[in-house]
């Protein structure tokens, strides 16, 4: 998915290792999604149409991703500048479960996972599901003791989102369940994210050629 979306100025970062995860038996060596987003940031700045117009790109990450708190600080002016990407447009993909918990019990726990670890341990990718099927898979991950979890309350995460939006105008909000429930071509694939302005939604598939 990442390779396909890079060609149209959108980065869906879901399958990358979280910061500090293991790679091929080496402990804690993964740099996380922020390092790769910085590459997208520099690419957008470099592609300026002969100095006429700076390139732009949106970066989408799921709200259950372990790096989401750091992702929300991408464009803020405080903190480590090595972890910033001021020229990209962050966006978050939400399931309906998140907003339902925010409405019914905002102090509920929200569990963050490493997508690569989920795939290795559980044998599936959370981002490949939506709606009730996604909620079922998410709850299986919560119950799985072999998965490392980062736990925030829904309230704390909403506060981080609002703080970022007040300071930077981002992240954009993409409700993936709603998009896929309304998808007239759901028999042909799944919608993972959107475009720079969050108004175009198309089926996305891996490039197999």
Language-model features: locations:
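Active-site cavity-forming subdomains of large catalytic enzyme subunits
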Residues: 1-209
